[in-house]
């Protein structure tokens, strides 16, 4: 074990030695940088940018750029970065984590790599845990960057889209992790590229990196929306479908399980819902609900495909006959069956977009972070984010006194001892910080201190601005501050001059399940070589002690006749606690790793959809893409209707009916013509006819209008199907563990089923786009619309509505208007006939 530790330590030492050489280079440049005037110093920024365009790299510029920032910081902020801060900056620039102890100046350290990487013009994001810290750092460090001629932006939750665009366009952007993630998701839901706010993700420096990438790694960011009319529509569609007659108003192909409305059925629907054209883009949702209602009634059979159990629809696995609890049919079929069976239609909020911090931050070209405590999670940072943890030496030696844990028999005895210790230190005038794991504990100690007449502050993470004031007072003479462990991170406790001899006393009321959090609490004392003392009070009734076998120790204390006021101070107990913490940390790491494996399935799918969506937004002409979709749709339809080996069993009539209903007009493709062809030859004449019809449609309107119509269709279909797919993947994920029977690996099942569902969604997108392009009439006031209004599910969401740009279109013939060909018939019964 000692050998391994030594090896790890040696690796860190080698890195420090290597960086020390660069620090010496930076120091050597000081004599040439110091004499420069402010204007000449500013001019260095332009010089560096020019050198980058001529082929130099940011690595080449590092020593000189760091020397420039150091001199500028001295002039503007009155702070001169130490050598150890230069090392921290080098580690950050190289895409690693700088572990720098509390009070060592992480914020100032970050300015060095931020400036250097901002010279590329690609943007640098400085990420903090809350908006107060983002604003503070942007205001303070922004002065330095602006002095050197760089632009600084701050991205807040309350900002408008225009303000966010300005913030992201700056060379350096300060933001919270939540806001960055939500902006990324919102950018992939917009309908016009002018509405996007983010640029490509280049370089991020995360402050308190362990808090964001480890503690919050399992929290997904979700933008959700309510499909409010959905429940009602399913009921209306269900009532309508019950009135339909087989063969006459809908046709059903037993072999392909394909069901669709006939011309009579379409007319009946238009009358029933008082609309002119069921295939109009305005009625996408209605048509979808009718189709799913048809499938629910005609294709899906109770006690064969599903069962009704305790008021819920439960799917039956067609291969094993097992109930697939937790799984729901996608694309609204499940709700249609719920309407059919008269059970409650579940209209839970729909996830429109989701991402975890793990996957968001892994998209950056380069990522780095700073914290006082990262070494214990080094394996996770290396394996998941490809970042090494480099422990930066402190500027002055740490002289803090970390005392061994005191263990009491009961919680009551422990808290009495804690309060007694606080009272004694308070009398001497020593400032005390009390760390608690839970808010209830802090309230209990607060009551006990009030009874003893000790004035104190309670610190929790609810009010960030007030938090900074409390922290500022926490180092004053006789101050007592009770804080939950995470509160106050990012703000230093500075000692008053009259308490420098004592230093700060940090009292922990129990061990956290993570050593890292305990180390953060300890690190509050003894900053920058100040004196200080830390002491943890434990009891046998603490959660960690209860979980990891403290019964023997409790029995031992009973045997020794120890009462509640007598603690034991034992290295053996401290080691047992540490080993328990390591086990919990290991379990938590495994859980985060597993989350990432599951999330990677959706990540790959999300990247495909978002990339294609981006291409659609930027494309001037989608015709080629849509023709490809039509080709795929036709080929799938041909394959589905000709899958039997014997030619007589092919369902050519079903194929022609499908084509007439969804893509072509009656008579475009004849049954007898197709019967003369082999399956691989059938697609060609069908596709040729489709292209001919597409050309006819293009002649009916100006090109600009046709191109916008294509985009409207693609966006509406893709966004609807994708949100339904995310929902289906959510249900699959929830139910997959319930099917871990036999030797089945749930992750592998999730990957396989998720992939099959994604392929099915892509096919469904292609088919629906083809149908709407060929069958829908063009609206007069055509505009792109969001499928559902999204709302960020997080305190820092901004549910800002996307501004839509109307695209005004020319005159179009209504379905019930007289046809312009002069036949005297209504347009829908003449040139606008819909099969």
Swiss-Prot record:
Biological-process GO terms, alphabetical: intracellular protein transmembrane transport; protein import; protein targeting; protein transport by the Sec complex
Annotated family: Belongs to the SecA family.
Protein localization: Cell membrane; Cytoplasm
Top-level taxon: Bacteria
UniProt cross-references to InterPro entries, sorted A to Z: Helicase_ATP-bd (IPR014001), Helicase_C-like (IPR001650), P-loop_NTPase (IPR027417), SEC_C_motif (IPR004027), SecA (IPR000185), SecA_CS (IPR020937), SecA_DEAD (IPR011115), SecA_motor_DEAD (IPR014018)
Entry protein name: Protein translocase subunit SecA
Primary localisation category: membrane
Binding of Zn(2+), residues: 819, 821, 830-831
Membrane topology listed for this record: Peripheral membrane protein
NCBIfam families assigned: PRK09200.1 (NF006630), PRK12904.1 (NF009538), secA (TIGR00963)
Organism of origin: Bacillus cereus (strain G9842)
GO cellular component: cell envelope Sec protein transport complex; cytosol; plasma membrane
UniProt region (Disordered), positions on chain: 788-807
Cofactor: binding comment: May bind 1 zinc ion per subunit.
Subunit relationships: Monomer and homodimer. Part of the essential Sec protein translocation apparatus which comprises SecA, SecYEG and auxiliary proteins SecDF. Other proteins may also be involved.
Entry EC number(s): 7.4.2.8
Entry cofactors: Zn(2+)
């Amino acid at each position: 074990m000692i050998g391994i530790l030594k090896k790890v330590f040696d690796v860190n030492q080698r890195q420090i030695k290597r960086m020390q050489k660069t620090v010496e280079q930076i120091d050597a440049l000081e004599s040439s940088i110091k004499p420069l005037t402010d204007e000449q110093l500013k001019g260095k920024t332009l010089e560096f940018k020019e050198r980058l365009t001529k082929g130099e790299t940011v690595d080449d510029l590092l020593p000189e750029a760091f020397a420039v920032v150091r001199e500028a910081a001295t002039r503007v902020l009155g702070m001169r970065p130490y050598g150890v801060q230069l090392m921290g900056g080098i580690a950050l620039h190289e895409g690693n984590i700088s572990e720098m102890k509390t009070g060592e100046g992480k914020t100032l350290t970050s300015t060095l790599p931020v400036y250097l990487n901002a010279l590329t013009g690609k943007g640098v994001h400085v990420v903090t845990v809350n908006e107060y810290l983002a604003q503070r750092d942007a205001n303070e460090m922004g002065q330095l960057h602006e002095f050197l001629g760089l632009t600084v932006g701050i991205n807040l939750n309350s900002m408008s889209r225009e303000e966010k665009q300005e913030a992201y366009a700056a060379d350096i952007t300060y933001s919270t992790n939540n806001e960055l993630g939500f902006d990324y998701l919102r950018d992939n839901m917009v309908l016009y590229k002018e509405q996007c706010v983010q640029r490509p993700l280049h370089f991020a420096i995360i402050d308190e990196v362990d808090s964001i990438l480890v503690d919050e790694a399992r929290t997904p960011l979700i933008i959700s929306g309510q499909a409010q009319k959905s429940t009602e529509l399913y009921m209306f569609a269900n009532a309508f479908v019950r009135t339909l007659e087989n063969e006459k108003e809908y046709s059903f192909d037993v072999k392909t399980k394909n069901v669709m409305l006939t011309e009579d059925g379409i007319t009946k629907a238009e009358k029933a819902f008082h609309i002119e054209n069921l295939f109009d883009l305005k009625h996408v949702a209605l048509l979808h609900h009718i189709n799913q209602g048809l499938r629910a009634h005609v294709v899906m059979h109770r006690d064969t495909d599903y069962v009704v159990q305790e008021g819920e629809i439960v799917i039956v696995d067609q291969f094993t006959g097992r109930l697939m609890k937790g799984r729901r049919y996608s694309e609204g079929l499940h709700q249609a069956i719920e309407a059919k069976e008269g059970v409650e239609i579940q209209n839970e909020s729909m996830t429109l977009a989701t991402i975890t911090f793990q996957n968001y931050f892994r998209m950056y070209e380069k990522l780095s972070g700073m914290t006082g405590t990262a070494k214990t999670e080094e394996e996770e940072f290396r394996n998941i984010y490809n970042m090494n943890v480099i422990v930066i030496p402190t500027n002055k030696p740490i002289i803090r006194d970390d005392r061994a844990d005191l263990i009491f028999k009961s919680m009551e005895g422990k808290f009495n001892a804690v309060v007694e210790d606080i009272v004694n230190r308070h009398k001497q005038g020593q400032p005390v910080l009390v760390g608690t794991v839970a808010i209830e504990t802090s309230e209990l100690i607060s009551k006990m201190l009030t009874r003893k007449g000790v004035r104190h502050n309670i610190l929790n993470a609810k009010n960030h601005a007030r938090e900074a004031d409390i922290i500022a007072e926490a180092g004053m003479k006789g101050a007592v501050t009770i804080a939950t462990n995470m509160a106050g991170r990012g703000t230093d406790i500075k000692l008053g001059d009259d308490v420098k001899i004592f230093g700060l006393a940090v009292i922990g009321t129990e061990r956290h399940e993570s050593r890292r959090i305990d180390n953060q609490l300890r690190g509050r004392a003894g900053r920058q070589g100040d004196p200080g003392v830390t002491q943890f009070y434990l009891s046998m009734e603490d959660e960690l002690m209860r979980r990891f076998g403290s019964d023997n120790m409790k029995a031992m204390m009973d045997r020794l006749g120890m009462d509640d006021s007598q603690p034991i101070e034992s290295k053996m107990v401290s080691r047992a606690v540490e080993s328990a913490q390591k086990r919990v940390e290991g379990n938590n790491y495994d859980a985060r790793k597993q989350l990432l494996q599951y999330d990677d399935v959706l990540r790959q799918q999300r990247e495909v959809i978002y990339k294609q969506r981006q291409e659609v937004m930027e494309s001037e002409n989608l015709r080629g893409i849509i023709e490809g979709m039509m080709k795929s749709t036709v080929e799938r339809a041909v394959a589905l209707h000709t899958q039997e080996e014997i030619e007589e069993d092919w369902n050519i009539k079903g194929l022609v009916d499908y084509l007439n209903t969804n893509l072509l007009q009656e008579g475009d493709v004849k049954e007898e013509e197709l019967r003369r062809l082999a399956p691989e030859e059938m697609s060609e004449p069908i596709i040729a006819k489709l292209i001919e019809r597409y050309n006819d449609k293009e002649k009916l309107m100006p090109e600009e209008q046709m191109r916008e119509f294509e985009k409207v269709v693609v966006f509406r279909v893709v966004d609807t199907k994708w949100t339904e797919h995310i929902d289906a993947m959510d249900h699959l994920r929830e139910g997959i563990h319930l099917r871990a029977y036999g030797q089945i690996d749930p992750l592998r099942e999730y990957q396989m089923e998720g992939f099959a569902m994604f392929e099915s969604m892509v096919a469904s997108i292609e088919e629906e786009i083809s149908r709407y392009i060929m069958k829908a009439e063009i609206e007069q006031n055509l505009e792109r619309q969001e499928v559902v209004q999204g709302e960020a599910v997080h305190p820092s969401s901004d549910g800002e509505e996307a501004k839509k740009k109307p695209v005004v279109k020319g005159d179009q013939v209504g379905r019930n208007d007289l046809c312009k060909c002069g036949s005297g018939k209504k347009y829908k019964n003449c040139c606008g006939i819909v099969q």
